[in-house]
Curated annotation (Swiss-Prot):
PROSITE patterns noted in UniProt: RIBUL_P_3_EPIMER_1, RIBUL_P_3_EPIMER_2
Protein name in UniProt: Ribulose-phosphate 3-epimerase
Cofactor binding, per record: Binds 1 divalent metal cation per subunit.
Enzyme class: isomerase
Length: 229
């Protein structure tokens, strides 16, 4: 899956940004493919971050497509409003609902792409049959809830399984990864078949976030190209 620049998609995570300067922090990653927003409710995960009002404010100050990752209970109720607000992609957790296909349908009806995410310890097999109802699969490579964690390479087996289905023409879906992505880990994720890479500290911890986005994109692109040769 190519981004707007012809390479892999890079989605800086504002969880690692300065929350007092979110408009400036969004501008600092101009050229990114998506802007990743982690919404946490303090219930599904132990941390509490931001919600719909902040997302609406961000949408008013940036043209970067908004990638909303909802780490919340009851996505059946809360996911569609993010799509209605103008988010490009709205992802919720498989573990948070008994009706993932219905939630995906409501997100799409509200005008956004629908994504489903699984925690590192959640098997993907029970959800393979419903993936055609989704536009994005977000594989968590850390335990959701906090940024700055160490990458869990074992989750790449999930990526490889879905990439095999995509390459065989059995499925059309974008594979995204979130957690511990940096210049030490992005190549192995790209080689496994990831399309979109969420990066927090690796971008916002850099002196030049936009340059960090470009560098990560180059690394992922080179690894993906090597895989296809």
């Amino acid at each position: 899956m190519a981004g707007s620049t012809g390479g892999p998609l890079i989605a800086p995570s504002i969880l690692a940004a300065d929350f007092a300067r979110l408009a400036d922090e969004a501008a600092a990653v101009n050229g990114a493919d998506w802007l990743h927003v982690d919404v946490m409710d303090g219930h599904f995960v132990p941390n509490l971050t931001i919600g719909l009002p902040v997302v609406e404010s961000l949408l008013a100050v940036t043209d970067i497509p908004m990638d909303c990752h909802l780490m919340i209970d009851n996505p059946d109720r809360w996911a569609p409003p993010y799509a209605e607000a103008g988010a490009y992609n709205v992802t919720f957790h498989a573990e948070a609902t008994d009706n993932p296909v219905g939630v995906a349908r409501d997100i799409r009806a509200a005008g956004a792409k629908a994504g489903i995410s699984v925690k590192p310890g959640t098997p993907l097999e029970p959800y393979l049959d419903i993936l055609p109802h989704f536009d994005t699969l977000l594989v968590m490579s850390v335990e959701p809830g906090f940024g700055g964690q160490r990458f869990i390479p074992e989750v790449l087996s999930k990526v490889r399984a879905v990439r095999k289905m995509v390459d065989a023409g059995e499925l059309t879906i974008l594979v995204e990864i979130d957690g511990g992505i940096n210049d030490d880990t992005i190549e192995q994720a790209a080689e496994a078949g990831v399309d979109c890479f969420v990066a927090g500290s690796a971008v916002y911890g850099a002196d030049d976030p936009a340059a960090a986005v470009a560098a990560l994109r180059r690394q992922a692109g080179a690894a993906s190209l090597h895989l296809s040769l």
